[in-house]
A protein has these predicted regions:
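Active-site loop-to-helix "anion-binding N-cap" substructures in soluble metabolic enzymes
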Residues: 1-139
Length: 139
């Protein structure tokens, strides 16, 4: 059942949110469009891990990294967005667990992972293990 986050009790949103966004553009209009979701989750949940993709790379491609997006998004939300440039899920879990409430993380381009485009269930499980809830605001 699909639920809208503004229709869910705030206590249900406590914890870490895995937020799927779509940054697959050359400008920032999609970032602007998702600011209300990010701000709502910051109030309601403890931490946010943002996941997204860009392009169709065959492995790592520096030009398609989301590193610059973390800087731009930091300016938009008025707080640091921690960029995570690796996909070592145990390290990511530790980093998020050690961070204070209100922290925002941005994982690098999910398309750098072979399993992203083929909807690998194991990758889905690894991503899901990072958070308490999943919020999709990719459009």
């Amino acid at each position: 059942m699909i639920k809208y986050i503004d229709k869910v009790k705030a206590s249900t949103l406590a914890g870490t949110a895995l937020l799927r966004l779509d940054f697959n553009t050359t400008d920032n209009w999609r970032m602007q469009a998702v600011l209300p979701t990010i701000k709502y989750l910051l109030k309601a949940s403890g931490k946010i891990i943002i996941i997204s993709h860009r392009g169709r790379p065959d492995g790592f491609d520096k030009k398609l990294s989301l590193k610059k997006d973390a800087v731009v998004l930091s300016g938009m939300v008025g707080k640091k967005v921690v960029f995570i440039d690796n996909f070592d899920f145990s390290k990511i879990k530790s980093q998020v667990a050690a961070a204070p409430k209100g922290s925002i993380f941005l994982l690098d381009n999910l398309r750098f992972l072979k399993g992203e485009e083929i909807n690998d269930p194991e990758l889905g499980k690894q991503l899901a293990s990072l958070a308490d809830m999943y919020v999709n605001d990719a459009f």
